[in-house]
Swiss-Prot record:
It comes from Bos taurus. Insulin-independent facilitative glucose transporter. Residues 1-48, 106-111, 163-168, 223-282, 343-349, 492-502, 554-621 are cytoplasmic. SUPFAM superfamilies: MFS general substrate transporter. This is Solute carrier family 2, facilitated glucose transporter member 12. The gene is SLC2A12. GO terms for biological process: circulatory system development; D-glucose transmembrane transport. Residues 70-84, 133-141, 190-201, 304-321, 371-470, 524-532 are extracellular.
Length: 621
């Protein structure tokens, strides 16, 4: 639970041995926060939690397809490519929405965007519930994708702009915590409805009431004070700040906001790619960071968790859904400490730890799966009802074949088929027992699908199966403390307020575009090169992300958004290696500025810029 403090009380989450303040002299001496920086009252907490409900809904929608797909692919007789399209259609909607989301957020406000996205969630969910065809299913998933993209961007920006600077990391990361809780509930729902007829409709419909309630609640919450200042409503912004900070005098914080926004009205979208205020470097950092979020493989674990777990030995839909629930539990448990400690430890440290552990776990997972000797997975087989009946007698899994016909089983034991064949089940009614056998018939009328005939399940050590699951869980845990929550905190901080919405929308487009590409090809690539080599590719990407974080990502804990913007505007930001700026206060801040208040530091820095002197940033804790 987030500690709540009144206007008079000190911070309850100070880093040990260091002052938690963000203004000049008070921070250096370990004194209390100024009133405008202290305010993390109940109203701020309530607004942040209500907005973060979007995170829960996003997580639920991202995770629910993992189990729903197991039922839908059989009901609608989906091919491998169609399964990929069902999963990826959500990402198509998200990508399309991200292209216009920034304009909506900057023009109509962060709160209005959240309300609109909740309405889209309800509409898309209704379409999914009544969908009776592949086409309507795709349409509903696209609508859900629009909700996810718009909601994700608006929520991060909204919380970052209403939070006091010393609680910003905690409150923004709350959104990621809600996302993983939503994923966990999605996996629980997958398990609960795994054996219920048309259970996928219940899975898709459970979130509608919560989405409606959030839209209503957000209507009564305040707009972002920074957005109000951007629109010229300074009096309204002052009132909102007073409620959020639980203080009467908001002059100082309002002055800082106005000063930081004064020169930002002239930003255009194309300024993101120009050298002005070093925006080109900032957008490069943002785009590369979200690239690594996706290219390290986490989306595939999220969307195809149940499918992948079936391929490594968790055989039934129910068993695979239950195992994927463990993935959700690990995500929640791992995200909680990252959320609570981000303001003390810093986002950069968590990113480094997460990328390192991800690489180690992926190597282990790849080596283990090499030893399982999976000659082929049955992920892409045809899931028609006739093949579903076959599943009762023939088990498809890594290193497994079992059939009621013992002679058939012995005949194929140890054999591997590398080419495609059309397999159909035939029902032997001659002996009256209705035993199922296999017939490999060319041009049998069924779609071309791939099967594996390999060794008995007894040949696959149980230890390897569980070690593979353990490696997967460690990988998920590492992602949940690093590349899961931290990039969105960094993105909400590194762009100036006047262009933040458009910058977030562009990085969101990159995020969804890469996600779409990876998810749309995962099953195909896995069939082509095998799961072990997919793991090794993700390992290389995790190590590359570690190097990128060390070199380029700033440590912004304890700094105000205005201070961060001033520092990143330096043309020699990367050359000066300011990545660990929290540990180099005296090098970064002229002594004459250290005793001044934040707004004075900001204005003085602007004067220094006009004289051709380097722009400096007040350090955080």
């Amino acid at each position: 639970m987030v500690p709540v403090e009144n206007a008079e009380g000190p911070s309850l989450l100070k880093p040990k041995g260091r002052a938690a303040e963000t203004d000049g002299s008070d921070r250096a001496s370990g004194g209390p926060h100024p009133p405008w920086a202290r305010g993390c009252g109940m109203y701020t907490l309530l607004s942040s939690v209500t907005a973060a409900v979007s995170g829960f809904l996003v997580g639920y929608e991202l995770g629910i397809i993992s189990g729903a797909l197991l039922q839908i692919r059989t009901l609608l007789v989906l091919t491998c490519h169609e399964q990929e399209m069902v999963v990826s259609s959500l990402l198509i909607g998200a990508l399309l929405a991200s292209l216009i989301g920034g304009v909506l957020i900057d023009r109509y406000g962060r709160r209005a965007a959240i309300i609109l996205s909740s309405c889209l969630l309800g509409l898309g969910s209704l379409v999914l519930i009544i969908s009776l065809s592949y086409t309507t299913l795709i349409g509903g998933r696209i609508a859900i994708g629009v909700f996810i993209s718009l909601s994700s961007t608006a929520t991060c920006v909204y919380i970052a702009e209403i939070a006091p600077q010393h609680r910003r990391g905690l409150l923004v990361s709350l959104n990621e915590l809600m996302i993983v809780i939503g994923i966990l509930f999605a996996y629980i729902s997958n398990y609960a409805f795994a054996n219920i007829s048309h259970g996928w409709k219940y899975m898709f419909g459970l979130v509608i009431p919560l989405g409606v309630l959030q839209a209503i609640a957000m209507y009564f919450l305040p707009p972002s004070p920074r957005f109000l200042v951007m629109k010229g409503h300074e009096e309204a912004a002052s009132k909102v700040l007073g409620k959020l900070r639980a203080v009467l005098d908001t002059t100082e914080e309002l002055t800082v906001i106005k000063s930081s926004l004064k020169d930002e009205y002239q930003y255009s979208f194309w300024d993101l790619f120009r050298s002005k205020d070093n925006m080109r470097t900032r957008i490069m950092i943002g785009l590369t960071l979200v690239f690594f979020v996706q290219i390290t493989g986490q989306p595939n674990i999220l969307f195809y968790a149940s499918t992948v777990l079936k391929s490594v030995g968790f055989q039934s839909n129910e068993a695979a859904s239950l195992a994927s629930t463990g993935v959700g539990v690990v995500k929640v448990i791992s995200t909680i400490p990252a959320t609570l400690l981000v303001d003390q430890v810093g986002s950069k440290t968590f990113l480094c730890i997460g990328s390192s552990v991800m690489a180690a776990s992926l190597v282990t997972m790849g080596i283990v799966n090499l030893n399982i000797h999976m000659n082929f997975t049955s992920i892409c087989r045809n899931h028609s009802p006739i093949n579903q009946s076959l599943d009762e007698s023939v088990f498809y899994g890594p290193g497994n074949l079992s059939a009621s016909n013992d002679t058939l089983r012995e005949s194929f034991k140890g054999m591997t088929f590398h080419s495609r064949s059309s397999l159909r089940p035939t029902r032997n009614d001659i002996n009256g027992r209705g035993e199922t056998t296999l017939a490999s018939l060319p041009n049998a009328g069924l779609s071309q699908t791939e099967y594996q005939i390999v060794t008995d399940s007894a040949d696959v050590p149980t230890f390897l199966k569980w070690l593979s699951l353990a490696s997967l869980l460690v990988y998920v845990a590492a992602f949940s403390i690093g590349l899961g929550p931290m990039p969105w905190l960094v993105l909400s901080e590194i762009f100036p307020g006047g262009i933040r919405g458009r910058a977030m929308a562009l990085t969101s487009s990159m995020n969804w575009g890469i996600n779409l590409l990876i998810s749309l090809t995962f099953l195909t690539v896995t069939d082509l090169i095998g799961l072990p080599w997919v793991c090794f590719i993700y390992t290389v990407m995790s190590l590359a992300s570690l190097v990128f974080v060390i070199v380029f990502i700033p440590e912004t804990k304890g700094c105000s958004l205005e201070q961060i913007s001033v520092e990143l505007a330096k043309e020699n930001y990367v050359k000066n290696n300011i990545c660990f700026m929290s540990h180099h206060r005296e090098e970064l801040v002229p002594k004459q500025l250290q005793k001044r208040k934040p707004q004075e530091q900001f204005l003085e820095s602007k004067k220094l810029r006009g004289k051709g002197q380097p722009r400096q940033l007040s350090s955080e804790v």
